[in-house]
């Protein structure tokens, strides 16, 4: 695997010098300063590429080229936004950057309720608490009909939890959910959030798939023409939330994408921390079935709790993800490609890490502190080395 590291640009508290010292050779970054939907110019792409290369690294993957909400709702200037997206892909290809991670999650990108969940060893992790999320949705957001998405027990627990929250607890929970986490291109006030949810009131799973198909049929041929590989990121968490459909959550969703646009430019990001939240997702089977279309991997683990919809981000080699079997399946896919004469490695990043050691005293991007990811990268690197030596060095 190609060892990569997500970098949020010049304002990231983790420097490119830090990235290189961590042992990564590739950088995963994006032009976050360009508004959603606008074309990434060749000039801006080359400027970022030069910064990365001057640090002795390569820009391996774009994460992400965000998709304008008009495309997801099939309203407004969606045709212009699609045309802009096509041009951005052409410009990236012209600059030699050919792997693009993206997602099709409506309104919200990845979501957590607690950004400072303290683990038994004193480090901090990200957590999604189903009951706190229900309390937000029913008692803070007050979304009409939200009760239909929860069990009677969850509704009662959410009311009880809300009753114990201070004003600061409520404000913090609201910020965590709607203000935008690292990599998310949208942040909202509560009123803005309600208005954006209203745009989806008539969009169910079938309609969102229809809108996604329009996007894929416009984008994938351009990607194929210029040699770009599109790698869709799964929903996080991988299930409907806030009354919004989610359509990249299961192996069935992956198959739908392939059936909709059967091009090798239409590929996947295997994010084990997102797909792995669902107990019914067999990660190794996903890799084996869609291995030739996996162009990027996020390797991390999560741990489901007593309520199976509640989870926290575990250490990379712990939790519900069998990292050994996952890495083994990825390495096997790389060797299959090598046997076909393809030498390209699959870019891997350790994804999120725990906030730990000296980083506990620093301001960090949630999930993206340096030391926790350094630990995760080293652990996954060790797993891969052992697999390579044991199975492929003879």
From Swiss-Prot:
Its cofactor is Fe(2+); Mn(2+). One of its GO terms (biological process) is D-glucuronate catabolic process. GO terms for molecular function: ferrous iron binding; manganese ion binding; mannonate dehydratase activity. It is an enzyme of class 4 (lyase). This is Mannonate dehydratase. The lineage of its organism: Bacteria, Pseudomonadati, Pseudomonadota, Gammaproteobacteria, Enterobacterales. Belongs to the mannonate dehydratase family. It catalyses: D-mannonate = 2-dehydro-3-deoxy-D-gluconate + H2O. Pfam families: UxuA (PF03786). Pathway: Carbohydrate metabolism; pentose and glucuronate interconversion. Its EC number is 4.2.1.8. The gene is uxuA. Catalyzes the dehydration of D-mannonate. Gene3D superfamilies: Divalent-metal-dependent TIM barrel enzymes. It comes from Escherichia coli O1:K1 / APEC. Keywords: Iron, Lyase, Manganese.
